[in-house]
Amino acid sequence: WIMGHMVNPFEQVDEFLNLGANAIEFDIDFDENGIAKYTHHGIPCDCGRLCTKSAVFTEYLDYVRQVTSPGDPKFRKELVLLALDLKLQRISSEKAYAAGVDVATKLLDHYWKRGWNGGRAYILLNIPLVEDYEFIKGFKDTLRKEGHEQYNAKVGINFTGNEDLDEIRKVLEKLGEDEHIWQADGITSCFARGTDRLEKALEKRDTPGYKYISKVYAWTLVRSSIMRRSLRLGVDGVMSNNPDRVVKVLKEKEFANKFRLATYADNPWEKFTPI
C-alpha cells in the first residue's frame, strides 16, 4: 500500500492517485464537542507541504465516495484504502466516544449511504493515542445501533502515536479487538527516525498466533534511501508525500519481484504469507 499523506483538499485526491498512490490519508479536525468538521492538518506539518488546505468533512466523504464507487464518472479503481487521521489529541479524551459516534454516523450517511450505492474502499481509523480508545467503542456502538454492523468488515484500527506496542495490545484486548489491526511507525518527514520500534512491530506481526498486528507501515517517507530501508525490513505499506518515488523504488531490481501494489482484491486485514 502506498499511502498519500495529508490529502485534505478535493483536488489532491486525483493528484496523489496520479502519482501512484493506492491509498490516501486525510486529517479530521473536531470541534470541542467531538464533532468532525473539516479535513485539515494545521501548522506545523511536514516540510515542503502546505499545512492549511482543507475541506468540509461531509463534502470530502461525498467526493471520495464517488472516486471509490464503480460506475461513477469519477471512479478510480486504484484507490482501495482510506486512512482517517483522527486529530483526537486536540480535544478532551472525554469526547472521544462522541467523536466515534459522529464519524461513524457521517460515514454511514455520506460514504456508505447506508447500503445504497456507497463507496467500496476499506477504512483505516488512525487513532493518535491509546487514551482515546473510547472512539472505537463509540464508532462500533453506532454501527450496531444503526443496524449496519456489516461495515465492520471494511474497517480497521491503527494507533499512530508510536506508543509501547504491549500497551497498545492491552488496550486492544480490553476492547475485545484482535483483528483488522494495522500498526504505524514513523515521524514527520522533517526528522530522521531509527528502526527499533518498526522492527519490533514487524517481529510481532510475523509471530505465529499473534493477532494484534496484521499490517505494518512506515511514515512519512520522502527519501528513496529510507523507502528502501523500510522495504528491506518487510513493511506492508509506506506513507509518503511523494508516491511517485515509492513507485520508482518498487521498480528497482532488488524489489520488483518481491513487492507489488495492492489492489481491491487484496484483503488489508490478512497477514501476507509469502508463497
UniProtKB/Swiss-Prot annotation:
Disulfide bond residue pairs: C45-C51, C47-C190
Gene Ontology molecular functions: lyase activity; metal ion binding; phosphoric diester hydrolase activity; toxin activity
InterPro entries from the UniProt entry: PLC-like_Pdiesterase_TIM-brl
Catalytic activity: an N-(acyl)-sphingosylphosphocholine = an N-(acyl)-sphingosyl-1,3-cyclic phosphate + choline; an N-(acyl)-sphingosylphosphoethanolamine = an N-(acyl)-sphingosyl-1,3-cyclic phosphate + ethanolamine; a 1-acyl-sn-glycero-3-phosphocholine = a 1-acyl-sn-glycero-2,3-cyclic phosphate + choline; a 1-acyl-sn-glycero-3-phosphoethanolamine = a 1-acyl-sn-glycero-2,3-cyclic phosphate + ethanolamine
EC number(s) given by UniProt: 4.6.1.-
Major location (coarse): secreted
Record's subcellular location: Secreted
Alphabetical keyword list: Cytolysis, Dermonecrotic toxin, Disulfide bond, Hemolysis, Lipid degradation, Lipid metabolism, Lyase, Magnesium, Metal-binding, Secreted, Toxin
Gene Ontology annotations of biological process type: killing of cells of another organism; lipid catabolic process
Cofactor note: Binds 1 Mg(2+) ion per subunit.
Tissue distribution: Expressed by the venom gland.
Keyword Methyltransferase: no
Enzyme active site: H5, H41
Requisite cofactors: Mg(2+)
Superkingdom of this protein's organism: Eukaryota
Positions contributing to Mg(2+) binding: E25, D27, D85
Family from the record: Belongs to the arthropod phospholipase D family. Class II subfamily.
Free-text function comment from the UniProt entry: Dermonecrotic toxins cleave the phosphodiester linkage between the phosphate and headgroup of certain phospholipids (sphingolipid and lysolipid substrates), forming an alcohol (often choline) and a cyclic phosphate. This toxin acts on sphingomyelin (SM). It may also act on ceramide phosphoethanolamine (CPE), lysophosphatidylcholine (LPC) and lysophosphatidylethanolamine (LPE), but not on lysophosphatidylserine (LPS), and lysophosphatidylglycerol (LPG). It acts by transphosphatidylation, releasing exclusively cyclic phosphate products as second products.
The protein's name in its UniProt record: Dermonecrotic toxin SpaSicTox-betaIIA1
Organism: Sicarius patagonicus
